[in-house]
Amino acid sequence: MFKIFRTKWFRSAPVLATLWLSSTAVILIGVNSYFPDYLFMPMS
């Protein structure tokens, strides 16, 4: 079922970079929805 995770295609650099950037963007958007100005003014 999870054979795609063991293939050479999935471990290539562009795929890993896309997954990393996408997950980082999702985390930042999620945090920004709960704390709207926290990313710009963290000390306020």
UniProtKB/Swiss-Prot annotation:
Starting at the broadest rank, the lineage of the source organism is: Bacteria, Bacillati, Cyanobacteriota, Cyanophyceae, Synechococcales
Report the principal subcellular site: membrane
SUPFAM superfamilies in alphabetical order: Subunit IX of photosystem I reaction centre, PsaJ
Q: Which family is it part of?
A: Belongs to the PsaJ family.
Keywords noted in UniProt? Membrane, Photosynthesis, Photosystem I, Thylakoid, Transmembrane, Transmembrane helix
Coiled-coil annotated residue ranges, if any: none
- Subcellular locations according to the entry: Cellular thylakoid membrane
Function description: May help in the organization of the PsaE and PsaF subunits.
Per UniProt, what is the membrane topology?
Answer: Single-pass membrane protein
Name the record gives this protein: Photosystem I reaction center subunit IX 2
Q: Does the keyword Thylakoid apply?
A: yes
Species the sequence originates in: Prochlorococcus marinus (strain NATL2A)
